[in-house]
């Protein structure tokens, strides 16, 4: 017995010794702050931390930095210098209450306040790196003027516009300040010691294990829009078409959860205009289909005020409610309108108001030839009904009501703006399937107003920060478009706030 006990003791000692050895890595780096993700949150955090004197390494999964922020168009701000010069009255008080009321006060009020209060300062902070703003627009039709659309910028002989201009400017500034970006090196796991986060494990493009030892970690990996398992588990509508989500696999969220982070907002998405898979934001086929004229469900009935397409969350929620499939129907007269006069409703800066859809026929006929059920060209309403699986009587009644509304300039069912009432009268009739699309997920990691990651009970996890699409709390159950540019602003401002607090923490 005595011998057996000594063997067990020896084995226990050996195991303890092995566990105390440093984790093996092919490459090891030491820094003050490591940022996981080189998008809007990550680059803003990296530049801000460097400007405050910290040494910073950014781990970026893709071959280029910027992430989906490269495709943003404008940035939210309240009480900006540009707004004041133009006599635009959008106070911080108004913006804060608008965001909170939209969420029915389910959003994290201290966090929302912190973002709103910093928003104007961040616009001017970016200007010192060459970023400029073309104009101030609205997010949703009739909304407040908060969307500061970014203008063109030239860096090293290459021209950038909109979000890519901001990302290029931050990328250049970060490198000028001596920051290090490890491209094609995703973070995989947080390193925790004595209940503090002290680094990140990652893997580079050669499959080598990389360890970055740091005093603080900032997470901003862009959500989980490319992770089908997470979509199935958390998204309200997991079959949504995700737009521009390459590499967004949720690693940042998962590593934070594994380290004890609370969960918040994992189910929230950034709904986009309905459309079809594999069509770009500049598609003329989609631009025609989403004009707010006549949408029907698979039974042939109107289900919404079509003009709510101008506020994506509304159109996404309405489409989700009926099962995720609808059909846009317009006639030959409306097709001619698209070709000769242009569209009535812009698709952001991608297809602007009045654009003549000269690529519509080419795109439509190409999709029609695939015979995949996405588009139909029909000579009669009976044929339209047959193609979408609706009762012809029901569809004919819907169209008759639509045509009556167009004739009297009054929608007596959903009270749509009369400017968008158009008849469907003379064939051929053009039908396009509409399915839910999203520009990403928006939540997962619970944070406080300092962007410190917290547990489900609200206790901070020392040394860990998060922002952008990985972080929850900015919205309630639906992303809001009324404050134009809010998601880009959240990424940039959260990154700066995280950097400021991380630098204070490590000192």
Describe each PLM feature range.
Residues 9-20:
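Bacterial N-terminal signal peptides
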Residues 114-208, 228-229, 399, 405-426:
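Conserved redox-cofactor binding core of oxidoreductases
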Residues 27-41, 57:
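Beta1/beta-strand and adjacent pyrophosphate-binding region of the FAD-binding site
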Residues 51-71:
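Glycine-rich FAD pyrophosphate-binding loop
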Residues 77-114:
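Glycine-rich active-site loop/strand segments that organize a redox cofactor
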Residues 205-282, 482, 488-497:
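Glycine-rich loop(s) and the adjacent beta-strand/alpha-helix scaffold that form part
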Residues 189, 394-478, 482:
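A glycine-rich dinucleotide-binding beta-alpha-beta segment and adjacent secondary-structure elements
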Residues 253-255, 262-387:
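An anion/pyrophosphate-binding glycine-rich loop and adjacent beta-alpha core
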């Amino acid at each position: 017995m005595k011998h057996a006990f000594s063997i067990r003791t020896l084995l226990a000692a050996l195991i303890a010794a092995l566990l105390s050895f440093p984790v093996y890595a092919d490459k090891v780096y030491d820094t003050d702050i490591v940022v996981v993700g080189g998008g809007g949150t990550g680059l803003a955090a990296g530049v801000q931390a460097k400007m405050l004197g910290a040494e910073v390494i950014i781990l970026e999964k893709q071959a280029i930095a910027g992430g989906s922020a490269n495709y943003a168009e404008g940035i939210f701000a309240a009480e900006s210098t540009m707004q004041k010069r133009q006599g635009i009255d959008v106070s911080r008080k108004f913006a804060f209450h608008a965001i909170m009321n939209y969420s029915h006060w389910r959003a994290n009020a201290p966090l929302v306040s912190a973002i709103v209060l910093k928003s104007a300062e961040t616009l001017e902070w970016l200007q010192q790196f060459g970023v400029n703003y073309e104009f101030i627009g609205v997010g949703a039709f009739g909304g407040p003027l908060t969307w500061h659309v970014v203008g063109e910028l030239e860096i090293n002989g290459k021209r950038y516009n909109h979000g890519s201009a901001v990302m290029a400017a931050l990328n250049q500034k970060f490198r000028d300040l001596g920051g290090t970006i490890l491209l094609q090196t995703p973070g995989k796991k947080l390193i925790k010691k004595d209940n503090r986060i002290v680094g990140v494990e990652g893997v580079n493009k050669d499959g080598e294990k990389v360890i970055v030892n740091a005093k603080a970690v900032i997470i901003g990996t862009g959500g989980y829009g490319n992770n089908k398992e997470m979509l199935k588990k958390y998204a309200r509508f997991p079959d949504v078409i995700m737009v521009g989500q390459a590499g967004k696999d949720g690693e940042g969220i998962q590593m934070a959860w594994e380290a004890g982070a609370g969960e918040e907002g994992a189910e929230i998405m950034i709904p986009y205009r309905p459309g079809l898979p594999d069509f770009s934001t500049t598609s003329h086929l989609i631009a025609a289909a989403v004009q707010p004229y006549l949408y029907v469900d698979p039974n042939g009935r109107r289900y919404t005020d079509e003009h709510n397409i101008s506020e994506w969350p509304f159109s996404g929620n309405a489409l989700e409610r009926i099962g995720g499939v609808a059909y846009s129907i317009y006639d030959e007269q409306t097709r001619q309108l698209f070709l000769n006069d242009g569209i009535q409703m812009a698709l952001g800066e991608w297809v602007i108001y009045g654009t003549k859809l000269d690529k519509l026929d080419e795109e439509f006929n190409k999709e029609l030839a695939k015979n995949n059920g996405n588009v139909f060209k029909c000579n009669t309403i009976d044929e339209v009904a047959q193609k979408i699986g609706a009762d012809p009587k029901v569809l004919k009644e819907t169209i008759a009501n639509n045509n009556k509304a167009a004739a009297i300039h009054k929608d007596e069912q959903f009270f749509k703006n009369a400017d968008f009432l158009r008849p469907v009268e003379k064939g051929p009739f053009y039908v396009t399937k509409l399915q839910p699309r999203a520009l990403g997920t928006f939540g997962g990691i619970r944070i406080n107003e300092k962007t410190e990651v917290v547990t489900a009970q609200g206790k901070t996890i020392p040394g860990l920060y998060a922002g952008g699409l990985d972080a929850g709390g900015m919205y309630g159950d639906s992303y809001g478009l009324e404050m134009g540019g809010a998601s880009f602003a959240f990424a940039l401002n959260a990154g700066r706030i995280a950097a400021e607090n991380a630098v204070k923490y490590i000192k």
